[in-house]
Design a protein with these regions (language model features):
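Short His/Asp/Glu-rich catalytic/ion-coordination signatures at enzyme active sites or charged loops
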Residues: 159
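Hydrophobic alpha-helical transmembrane segments of integral membrane proteins
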Residues: 11, 15, 19, 128, ...
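Hydrophobic alpha-helical transmembrane segments of small proteolipidic membrane proteins, enriched
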Residues: 2-32, 142, 152-154, 162-165
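Core segments of transmembrane alpha-helices
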Residues: 130-139, 213
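Membrane-interfacial helix-loop-helix connectors in multipass membrane proteins
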Residues: 141-155, 224-229
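Polar-ligand-bearing catalytic/cofactor-coordination segments
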Residues: 2-6, 27-129, 162-216, 223-229
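Membrane-helix exit/interface motif
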Residues: 110-116, 138-148
Length: 229
């Protein structure tokens, strides 16, 4: 049983589709967000104003919207019930700014409605955090000590895979909600709706790439473990 096999064996070929998709997704989200950061939305509303309007309309006036440093550091915190927007999104009036702001509000609406995939994902976060940090240590122990450790590491790594897969419906649903809110509240017109969809679709592709990478890595690890049995 040799640790270099984790990197140099033929099963590495399984990861090539995920690597290529990840590269494409990274390029796509970067180029698309940059492109539409330069396109001003017709209404001239900032990301903060859009978020506030969507939240208030959906009975979430108690949820604060705050600026945070960094680029595309936007997120919704279900524990703190807070929408955090990067400064470029918070103060910006671009298509990207209002689209990202609406997407994070989509998560807030999911939280209010106890959207099942989001509830499940939040529930497994502590376990996933532990598993993601411990799995590779135990997997490497499996190569040096005993294959039983390898299978234990694979079991822990599977928690990360589950998290990545469950993230997909959460993110796609949040984007769907965002587009509906932008349209129903009259924040965007028909052409802008299409542009917003491009921004959110590009962002969603990164989650697809991450999920595919995790699944293929899990399959690869299982094949390596079986070959050492």
């Amino acid at each position: 049983m040799y640790p270099y096999g984790l990197y140099m064996d033929r099963t590495f070929l399984l990861l090539i589709p995920a690597i290529l998709l990840s590269m494409y997704a990274s390029f796509k989200v970067s180029s698309t967000t940059k492109k539409y950061f330069k396109v001003r939305a017709m209404k001239g509303m900032t990301g903060q104003e859009v978020a506030r309007r969507i939240l208030d309309y959906n009975g979430l006036s108690s949820v604060p919207v705050r600026p945070v440093p960094g680029s595309l550091t936007d997120h919704y915190d279900p524990r703190g019930k807070t929408v955090s927007l990067s400064e470029e999104v918070f103060y910006g009036t671009s298509i990207t700014s209002i689209s990202v702001a609406a997407h994070e509000c989509g998560h807030a609406i999911q939280d209010k409605e106890s959207y099942a995939p989001m509830v499940f994902r939040s529930a497994i976060v502590p376990a996933v955090n532990f598993a993601s940090s411990a799995s590779w240590i135990i997997i490497m122990m499996g190569f040096f000590v005993s294959r039983q450790f390898l299978w234990l590491g694979i079991l822990l790594f599977s928690a990360t895979v589950i998290f990545q897969v469950v993230t997909l419906p959460v993110e796609f649903n949040a984007s769907s909600r965002a587009l509906k809110q932008l349209e129903s509240l009259g924040i965007v017109g028909l052409d802008e709706h299409k542009e917003s969809k491009k921004v959110l679709s590009a962002a969603a592709l990164t989650y697809v790439a991450a999920a595919l990478a995790s699944i293929l890595q899990l399959v690869r690890l299982a094949l390596l473990a079986r070959s050492d049995d």
